[in-house]
Amino acid sequence: MVDNGGPKPLRDCDNHFGIPDDSGGIPRHVEHANAVAINSIKICAAAAKHGSHVIIENPVARGYKSQFAIKGRERHSSLWDFPPMVEFAKQYGMQVTVFDQCHLGASTQKTTQLLCSPAVHRFVNQTLGPL
């Protein structure tokens, strides 16, 4: 990854649960981020299981396999690559909408992905996307 002076990535394409530190362990702040993501997924799964609609928002993947790849971000791993998220999406038949936030008045492009419950996907896709 390109060093732009910002924080170092928590994950990469080979380490979806976190980039090991020098001792080979996952840093505490990455474990905390994983716990936040996993608990969020559990909440969404409970809602979906009881018939509620779910929409999860996060930036698109930017790694070398992504249609939205960015030079210098070849090893990028997004929330969408996180194994518990992949499993949740499969289990509940979640569907994807991708859109640029500038179409909604944002000052930058910020290509964003939404993971939607099947019952709301058509409306979300017609309203915001697709790219």
Task: Specify the residue positions occupied by each region the protein language model found.
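Conserved active-site and SAM-binding loop architecture
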Residues: 1-131
